[in-house]
Amino acid sequence: MSIREDRNQDATIYLGNLDEKVTDSILFELCLQAGPVVNIHIPRDRVRNSHNGFGFCEFLHEQDVEYACQILNQVKLFGKPIRVNRASQDRGVNTLIGANLFVGNLDPLVDERVLYDTFSALGQLVKAPQVARDENGRSKGYGFVSYDSFETADAAIEAMNNQFLMNKPITVSYAFKREGKGERHGDIAERKLAAAAKKNKVAVTPQSTLPPGFSPATPAPTSAANTPATIAATSIPPVPNVPLVGATTAVPPLSIPNVLPFTAAQHFPGMPAMPMMNVPMGPGGAPLVPPPPPGMVMASPSPAAATIPGAPVMPNIPFYQTINAQNGYSQQQRR
């Protein structure tokens, strides 16, 4: 089903927050529970063939609209609660606000998501941005953005007009009125109506969402200085207090069961220093020297160690020399 020019606005409801799996037939079966349905229209993207998350249903009788808003609002389709209200209310909100901007000279690569990410950073949008396209889905080079207040729209014009977007300077201004003769939105009459609505506390809520799969870009950190603190606070676990080597804080010894504690060797006055060697001792404290292996003779100790002043007394460790039985020459063993 498609939209009709002679649609009865008073007998039409607006359905928002639709899941991407919702089709015209599903919406028809749902709205049929409230009354006879004349037409179902879900605007779709010509390139991706996906809808923008909202649609319209025209009933045969105007009295069915109120009943449909009561029984269908917040009904879940594919796990998402839909939003249902009168289409005339949606039209009245847009007419009352009038903060609709025209964005021209768009690069062919600029789509609805780029417009949303760019202009949503300046204020609250009341509906998804629109890019005008031809019958083949190609961009016509302009689009529309709607804000919730004239103050935000004025700031967007001042900030974005003649700024580069996708390597092309864009033009941002108030859009022409559909029912006006060359008049643009944002005139004094619309601003007075918006001020009166704000004074009477008339709330304005967004009427649609981005196309399925589109999401606003995540803002980057404002400065590189706060990035390490954010990472440390969110992704790195706390480090336990481990005493550093050489710190003055005493560390208690480890307690291991069934193990005798190790004590360093103690030196008593009047006792000679004992050599820390695994050498068997004979009578009188002299080391036992094993006999030389066959084919080897005992060599005299080197006198160099005894001539060093202050050198500790070392036991005489035997060194052996290999005898060459063939030519009578001996070769000293590597030490």
Curated annotation (Swiss-Prot):
Entry keyword Repeat: yes
Main location class: nucleus
Chain spans, region Disordered: 204-223
Entry GO terms, CC: cytosol; nucleus; precatalytic spliceosome; U2 snRNP; U2-type prespliceosome
GO biological process per UniProt: mRNA cis splicing, via spliceosome; mRNA splicing, via spliceosome
Compartments, as annotated in UniProt: Nucleus
GO MF annotation: an example: RNA binding
Keywords: Nucleus, Repeat, RNA-binding
RRM domain mapped to chain residues: 13-84, 101-172
Entry annotated with the keyword Zinc-finger: no
A UniProt-annotated Pfam family: RRM_1
Assigned protein family: Belongs to the SF3B4 family.
PANTHER family: SPLICING FACTOR 3B SUBUNIT 4
Protein name: Spliceosome-associated protein 49
Protein's organism: Schizosaccharomyces pombe (strain 972 / ATCC 24843) (Fission yeast)
Gene: sap49
